[in-house]
Amino acid sequence: MAHTSESVNPRDVCIVGVARTPMGGFLGSLSSLPATKLGSLAIAAALKRANVDPALVQEVVFGNVLSANLGQAPARQAALGAGIPNSVICTTVNKVCASGMKAVMIAAQSIQLGINDVVVAGGMESMSNTPKYLAEARKGSRFGHDSLVDGMLKDGLWDVYNDCGMGSCAELCAEKFQITREQQDDYAVQSFERGIAAQEAGAFTWEIVPVEVSGGRGRPSTIVDKDEGLGKFDAAKLRKLRPSFKENGGTVTAGNASSISDGAAALVLVSGEKALQLGLLVLAKIKGYGDAAQEPEFFTTAPALAIPKAIAHAGLESSQVDYYEINEAFAVVALANQKLLGIAPEKVNVNGGAVSLGHPLGCSGARILITLLGILKKRNGKYGVGGVCNGGGGASALVLELL
């Protein structure tokens, strides 16, 4: 691990600490905690691991998608809850599923521009705590029944342009690239198997900050330190699930889509100059990044546009990339992008992904960067790329160089 002047230039963006909570299942182990609390836990742990005093932080940029009823300025709540001073600037980012990664990109840009030297970035989501809305109540509910709007569906999982769920877009992708139900189920089973193997080998231990959850009413509190989704795997059952979005000939199911979940992830970024000055251990550098967008209903394959942009921005060739994390919004997303980019399956999501681990919307973009860092460390890789699609037709991608 290097923090020598030869390997780090003054304006390099250096990752010096990372942490994430376990991914809690929908209405599961972490559902008693708001996203902001999960965010605080991840930030505090990342700073502690980085050996960076919270008082040195100049800015916090944090992703969050389902902000209704979280209270004002969620990123600020997460930061102050982690002991970061009142004088620190905080901004919440909403780029749907790419929020956590976009937050890291914005933080990196501020370091490259010389505006900041120490920034905390990441993302958080508690899908379990997303409220349902009485959308018409403010105008006066004069007569008859009122209907509830599901905030999670409306603001997180619905294509407003075509008035359909994200899963319907996944079906469109499966149709376009001729990806069968069996292929998607095989991929989903592989995601669980890889995730379980990684968990058993302790590959996630260095990523995770254990979360203490109050038992309430005098009952003892429990410690949550494992990704909850991995404990619910049943391959035979997964293959028998009914399609969720298309009755006739549908291929996308609850089993081969990402699971609704709760979690937070944080990264501490510093300039090369600051890393040398403070004698910090540099885990990796951010080499490049890129965003892309296309038709909203084809958000599924936007990573295939963003990933080459990020690799080019890093001044690399795709042949130099050792490992990829492509967020598994749906099994079909990982399969289609692998196909479009010509990537060998053994280089992608080697520790499982959102299908098995969970996909807390605002968190996932940051979570996959932390997982990617662990994979590069464990498998002696040098360059890794994280890519994540987002609702509305977009995607973000980022290149890491392990030191």
Curated annotation (Swiss-Prot):
Pfam families: Thiolase_C, Thiolase_N. One of its GO terms (molecular function) is acetyl-CoA C-acetyltransferase activity. K(+) binds at residues 254, 355. Disruption phenotype: Embryo defective and lethality when homozygous. Expressed in root tips, emerging leaves, young leaves, stems, and anthers at the microspore stage. One of its GO terms (biological process) is isoprenoid biosynthetic process. Signal peptide: none annotated. It catalyses: 2 acetyl-CoA = acetoacetyl-CoA + CoA. Its EC number is 2.3.1.9. SUPFAM superfamilies: Thiolase-like (SSF53901). One of its GO terms (cellular component) is peroxisome. Pathway: Metabolic intermediate biosynthesis; (R)-mevalonate biosynthesis; (R)-mevalonate from acetyl-CoA: step 1/3. The keyword Metal-binding applies. It is an enzyme of class 2 (transferase). InterPro entries: Thiolase (IPR002155), Thiolase-like (IPR016039), Thiolase_acyl_enz_int_AS (IPR020615), Thiolase_AS (IPR020610), Thiolase_C (IPR020617), Thiolase_CS (IPR020613), Thiolase_N (IPR020616). Keywords: Acyltransferase, Cytoplasm, Isoprene biosynthesis, Metal-binding, Peroxisome, Potassium, Transferase. The active site is at residues 97, 359, 389. CDD domains: thiolase. It is found in: Cytoplasm; Peroxisome. PROSITE patterns: THIOLASE_1, THIOLASE_2, THIOLASE_3. It comes from the Eukaryota. CoA binds at residues 237, 258. Catalyzes the condensation of two molecules of acetyl-CoA to produce acetoacetyl-CoA. Generates the bulk of the acetoacetyl-CoA precursor required for the cytosol-localized, mevalonate-derived isoprenoid biosynthesis. The generated isoprenoids are required for normal growth and development. Essential protein during embryogenesis. Belongs to the thiolase-like superfamily. Thiolase family. This is Acetyl-CoA acetyltransferase 2. It comes from Arabidopsis thaliana. The lineage of its organism: Eukaryota, Viridiplantae, Streptophyta, Embryophyta, Tracheophyta.
